[in-house]
Amino acid sequence: MEESLLSIIVALDAKSQYDALKIVEQLDPTLCRVKVGKELFTHEGPSVVKKLQEENFEVFLDLKFHDIPNTTAQAVCAAADLGVWMVNVHASGGRKMMETCVERLKAGNYQTQLIAVTVLTSMGREDLKDIGLDIEPVEQVKRLAKLTKESGLDGVVCSAQEAKILRELIGQDFSLVTPGIRPEGSNADDQKRIVTPKQAMLDGSTHLVIGRPITKAENPTEMLKSILASIA
């Protein structure tokens, strides 16, 4: 598959494998990838990943691992054993944790991409202050993105509003995976830092994570095609 044609990652915000498969029945694996998060994976385990792969979807396993280096690396390799396209960790776990994950993936000759979460898109300045970080979200994102790049990972999860800044800071050979994407007229839901698909791509995002606007649409396929047309 051509990477440029797979910029959209559909978040499968489903509680069961049945519901997830009903969603992907209405999607085309040549037009998007899918994301399996904590709720779905906790309910269904690895079997849901395998089922999605049987339907020819590449899977981003969004479990945001965050633990001591060895434990995190073992979890990342376990995800890679499932054959997922991408998996993530929390950059706040630190350099040693991230470097250990990269080393283990290379040692195992895995093709799975590893990215890091910088600042959760639901968090604003006051939220960071609550956990002892008296800093603007964008400054923390820059700090953690730079650390992620230095640690050898493939990219970061970041708000589209930070994408342009990160491109200048880090360069082109680095994935910027962006949640908080809402087509024109959509509800912001619980994402604080949101941007439209077209603007996100213009700002330098490489992949757009879109959930409810597609999965809750009356016709998910038509919504997906509409979004693709808007960023073409």
UniProtKB/Swiss-Prot annotation:
Binding site for substrate: 13, 35, 62-71, 121, 182, 191, 211-212
One cellular component (GO) term of this entry: cytosol
CDD domains to which the protein is assigned, alphabetical: OMP_decarboxylase_like (cd04725)
Keyword Flavoprotein: no
Coiled coil: none
GO biological processes: 'de novo' pyrimidine nucleobase biosynthetic process; 'de novo' UMP biosynthetic process
EC identifiers of the protein: 4.1.1.23
Active-site residues, as the UniProt record annotates them: 64
MF GO annotations: orotidine-5'-phosphate decarboxylase activity
Keywords: Decarboxylase, Lyase, Pyrimidine biosynthesis
Catalytic activity: orotidine 5'-phosphate + H(+) = UMP + CO2
Pfam hit, one: OMPdecase
UniProt-listed InterPro entries: Aldolase_TIM, OMPdecase, OMPdecase_AS, OMPdecase_bac, OMPdeCOase_dom, RibuloseP-bd_barrel
SMART domains referenced in this protein's UniProt entry, alphabetically: OMPdecase
Record carries keyword Acetylation: no
Annotated metabolic or biological route of this protein: Pyrimidine metabolism; UMP biosynthesis via de novo pathway; UMP from orotate: step 2/2
PANTHER family given in the database record: OROTIDINE 5'-PHOSPHATE DECARBOXYLASE
Protein function: Catalyzes the decarboxylation of orotidine 5'-monophosphate (OMP) to uridine 5'-monophosphate (UMP).
Family: Belongs to the OMP decarboxylase family. Type 1 subfamily.
Subunit text: Homodimer.
NCBIfam families attached to this UniProt entry: PRK00230.1 (NF001273), pyrF (TIGR01740)
Database matches in HAMAP family: OMPdecase_type1_B
Protein name per UniProt: Orotidine 5'-phosphate decarboxylase
Protein species of origin: Acinetobacter baumannii (strain ATCC 17978 / DSM 105126 / CIP 53.77 / LMG 1025 / NCDC KC755 / 5377)
